[in-house]
Amino acid sequence: MVLTTIQGLPIGNFSFTAFQLNGFSSLGEWRRFLFIPYFLLILLCAVANSILIFLIITRRALHSPMFVLIGVMAVMDLLMPIFVVPNMLLSFLFDWNQISLVGCLMQIFWVQFFGTFQSTLLLWMSLDRFFAICRPLSYHKHMQITSFLKFVIAPIIRNLLVNITLVSLAGKLHFCMKNEIDHCFCEHMGLVQLACEDTTLNNILGLSGPFIITTADFIFITVSYAIIFTSVMKSGKSSWKAINTCITHIIVMTFSLVLVLTAFVSYRTRNAFSPNIRVFFSTMYVLFPSCFNPIIYGVRTKEIRLQFLKLFKHVKVLAQ
C-alpha cells in the first residue's frame, strides 16, 4: 500500500510505521511448509547450544579461558536466532507478517550486533590460542579477566557505535514508498530501500560499517594464526597437537564468513540470485552457524567430547 496524491507524490510527511515481511511470498501455499525445516533448525540450535553451555558451566575441566570463550560463542549462537526465527515461524504458519518500525529497528540492531560480536569472539579466540602456544609462560597473566578486558572493550565499543549509528540513521528516515519488505526479517538495506528521501549516507555506512568490522577482525585473526603456525613449524612435530583447536576455530570462521559474504553480496550487488535465494542465504546466515558451531566444537574438541560422553552415560544410567 502506498499513500499518494493525485500526482503520485507522497502526502506531506506521511511515513509508514508498520511493515509487511513478504519473504518467500512467491511460494504461495507452499510457504507454510517452510515452518518444518526452520522449526527443526531452531530446535537443533537450542538443544546443541544449551548442552554446550551446560557442560561448560557445570564441568570444572572446561573452566579454562578457551572454553569460556566457546561458551560465550554458544550464548551468542543461542540468542541471535531468538530475535528472528520465532516471528518467521508465526509468519509461515499463520501469515502474521506485520512488524512495527520499532520492532524492525530492534531486529536490525540485534542481528547486526550479534553478527559483528561473533566476528569479534573469533578474534578473541585467536588471541587465546596465540598466548597459549606462542607465549605459554605468560598465558595466565594475559588471560586474567583484568588483563584481557583491554583486548575486548575496544571491539565491543566499536561494534556498539557502528550498529547504533546504522539503526539511528535508519530510524530517522521517512518511509512513504511502500511498506513491503521482501524478507523474512528486517534487514538494514531492505528497510532503507523503502525510504522516500536521500539514503546515500545510510547506503555507505550500511556497506562499509559491518564490512570494515568483519575485515579488520579477519586480518587480525589471520595474522595471529600465521604467527601460531610459524611458531609450531619451528618447534617441531610434537607441537602440532596444540593447534587442533586453532583448526576448529578456522573451520568455524570460514563457515561463518562464507555465509555472511554470500548474504551480503546477494543483497547489495546486482546478481542473478532470485528473491527467494537471497532470502534463503540471509536466513541461513542467522541459523546455520548457530546450529552447527556447537556441533563442530563438540566433535573436534577432545575435552568437550569427553565431557559430553560422560554426561550422556550419566543420563543413560538415570533413565534405567
Model segments located where?
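Transmembrane helical core of 7TM receptor-like proteins
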Residues: M1-Q320
